[in-house]
Amino acid sequence: MKKEVCSLAFFKAVFAEFLATLIFVFFGLGSALKWPSALPTILQISIAFGLAIGTLAQALGPVSGGHINPAITLALLIGNQISLLRAVFYVAAQLVGAIAGAGILYWLAPLNARGNLAVNALNNNTTPGKAMVVELILTFQLALCIFSSTDSRRTSPVGSPALSIGLSVTLGHLVGIYFTGCSMNPARSFGPAVVMNRFSPSHWVFWVGPIVGAMLAAILYFYLLFPSSLSLHDRVAVVKGTYEPEEDWEDHREERKKTIELTAH
């Protein structure tokens, strides 16, 4: 675990999550600003959120994995794909990034267009319980799409993961906006709520729904549909951040072998 945290790659990944979430929240919320000359449409907002996540997954995914969402990060932890410490750092970076993105937009947007900064709320007489189920379903399909399209074990063509993920986010918004404004991402809900200081009694919906939905998708995908072949010892090592794949051990062995040969000469 100490080795993982002390690496430059780790801190690059954490910063990438901060930056990606900042940009995602800025563009996503920005598409929902209520300009007097042209109010936003459901389609406009849905496409903007999808384009934002797809662009960022393509640009910064290779650095951090492109989670950009605490629900996805926690689901990958449950799915034994990342370490506990990485999950903690990622979630913290995502939440701070979301606040920063919402704060920048608040500062830039004129008062007559700012509105409530697209703070998530229950719409059309949706009860908190139903809203939670809606968020669960929306995030479940998003998480399944992410896990499947980025699974390195797949041998069949998967196309562009960034495009698939972007379309999944767009799909969720096309349905979810009518119920909850569509969160699917606790950071997306948390950022503007902090900046606007508008935490409704139903704010928990935008944490519980997405997190439970993503975790259920992780259990289904990583333990039932496509279970890992790792031993219990290796699974524990993944959570602790000390796991090294066999190919890494082979690389290390070759490097040591070359070093010994050079020293011998």
From Swiss-Prot:
GO function terms (MF aspect): identical protein binding; water channel activity
GO biological process: camera-type eye morphogenesis; carbon dioxide transport; cellular hypotonic response; odontogenesis; pancreatic juice secretion; protein homotetramerization; saliva secretion; water transport
UniProt feature: intramembrane region: 66-74, 181-191
Free-text tissue specificity from the UniProt record: Salivary glands, lacrimal glands, corneal epithelium in eye, trachea and lung.
Motif (NPA 1) on chain: 69-71
Extracellular side: 34-39, 109-126, 180, 192-203
Catalytically driven reaction(s): H2O(in) = H2O(out)
GO cellular component: apical plasma membrane; basal plasma membrane; cytoplasmic vesicle membrane; endoplasmic reticulum; microvillus; plasma membrane
Subcellular location: Apical cell membrane; Cell membrane; Cytoplasmic vesicle membrane
Cytoplasmic side: 1-12, 61-65, 75-87, 148-158, 225-265
Membrane spanning residue stretches: 13-33, 40-60, 88-108, 127-147, 159-179, 204-224
Residue window of motif NPA 2: 185-187
Main location group: membrane
Alphabetized InterPro entries for the sequence: Aquaporin-like, Aquaporin_5, Aquaporin_transptr, MIP, MIP_CS
Membrane topology: Multi-pass membrane protein
Keyword annotations: Cell membrane, Cytoplasmic vesicle, Glycoprotein, Membrane, Repeat, Transmembrane, Transmembrane helix, Transport
Glycosylation sites: 124
Assembly information from the UniProt record: Homotetramer; each monomer provides an independent water pore. Interacts with TRPV4; the interaction is probably indirect and regulates TRPV4 activation by hypotonicity.
Domain free text: Aquaporins contain two tandem repeats each containing three membrane-spanning domains and a pore-forming loop with the signature motif Asn-Pro-Ala (NPA).
Free-text function comment from the UniProt entry: Aquaporins form homotetrameric transmembrane channels, with each monomer independently mediating water transport across the plasma membrane along its osmotic gradient. Plays an important role in fluid secretion in salivary glands. Required for TRPV4 activation by hypotonicity. Together with TRPV4, controls regulatory volume decrease in salivary epithelial cells. Seems to play a redundant role in water transport in the eye, lung and in sweat glands.
Protein family membership: Belongs to the MIP/aquaporin (TC 1.A.8) family.
Name by which UniProt lists this protein: Aquaporin-5
Primary gene name: Aqp5
